[in-house]
Every structure is written in structure tokens, then in C-alpha cells.
UniProtKB/Swiss-Prot annotation:
Oligomer (believed to be a pentamer but probably hexamer). Keywords: Apoplast, Disulfide bond, Glycoprotein, Manganese, Metal-binding, Secreted, Signal. Glycans are attached at residues 78, 81. Residues 65-217 form the Cupin type-1 domain. The keyword Transferase does not apply. Belongs to the germin family. Disulfide bonds join 36-51. This is Germin-like protein 3-5.
Amino acid sequence: MEYGFKAAGLVFVVLLLQQAPVLIRATDADPLQDFCVADLNSEVTVNGHACKPASAAGDEFLFSSKIATGGDVNANPNGSNVTELDVAEWPGVNTLGVSMNRVDFAPGGTNPPHVHPRATEVGIVLRGELLVGIIGTLDTGNRYYSKVVRAGETFVIPRGLMHFQFNVGKTEATMVVSFNSQNPGIVFVPLTLFGSNPPIPTPVLVKALRVDAGVVELLKSKFTGGY
């Protein structure tokens, strides 16, 4: 009987180890062909986009100039502009597990506290100086890490951690960031709490934030139009 229990235990451990690669996978799935240019008009989506026929994909899918110039940093109250280059904007990165953003900041502009649930982020400041802040999980006591990053310097944001960038300089600033996902996703914390559709019930936020209903309603009014 003892031998039987030991054998059963060994089988369980082997099966568990076989699943380990699945459990620890933290990036997009590996590609199974040289390229798979996304067909953004296809109605077929299986955790990604269907491929265009190879004959319909010219070499232009390898190149993009969309982040060569930035947008209007004064177009929103944040004082920043994000030029996205994910699979929706650059179909050539479909299945390749990469994407990029360019972010331009007015003096005092911010990329508000947010999370990328599906990707690690690495970035370089091209001009100006940015305060980069990262907030750890409850495991670290919600520790706050920060540093002023200047032109030519780099930073990394672990996957899923809340973070922000803030232009502490007197001139405009620009950074370029890359992700290990074709679609890293983004969750803006203020917009998520106060601009969700439909809205989060006010009593929930009153209890969670420990403020009165008037404060919650005021904050909701600030995000009715999104960012």
C-alpha cells in the first residue's frame, strides 16, 4: 500500500512538472511562420488576428514611420500624446510579440498611472527629463520606486505593475517604449475607476476610497468624456 501511494505521488509530480512551461508562459505565443501580417478586416479572431495571404503582404509590413513625429501634447488635460504602434496600427507585428509607443509631453504633462496587463515595458527618453514612477504590489508593501530619467537613459516596467511618467523639465519631452506583446493592453487607473461604462456604483467607491459621495460624483464628472 505504501508503495502505491509513493507511485501515485511520483506520477502527480511528473504531471505537474509537465504543466510548468504552460504555467510560467508570460509572453505572446511563438510564431509558427516567418510573418503573419494581420488582416484587420477578417471576422476570424483567435487570441489575435488572422493572417493575410502571403501574396498580399508586401515588404511594407516590415517598416513604419508612424512614430517619426508626435502628436499635439496640448490636446488633452494630461498634457501628453501617445502615438501607438501595436498590431492595430502596424499589422506586421502580428504574432511577433512586440509593439512600440511614442509618448510626447508638454512641460508638466503626465502619462497618468496605468498598467499594461499583458506586457513588460522598456523605454528610452529621447529628449527632456521624465520622472518615472513604479508602484509595487501588496507583496512589497506597495513600495514606490522613482527616478528622473534624462535623454539617452532607459527604464524598465515589470509586467502588470502600476506606473506613470511625468515631465519635470521646462521643455517638451519625448520617450519611446517597446513591449513584449503585439497588444500590451492598458488600464488607466483614474479612468477605470471614474469613467467605466457603465459606471461603478458610487457606494462601492465611497467605501473603497473612504470619501463621501460628493467627492466620488465630482471625480466621475471629470472622466465622462474619457481621456
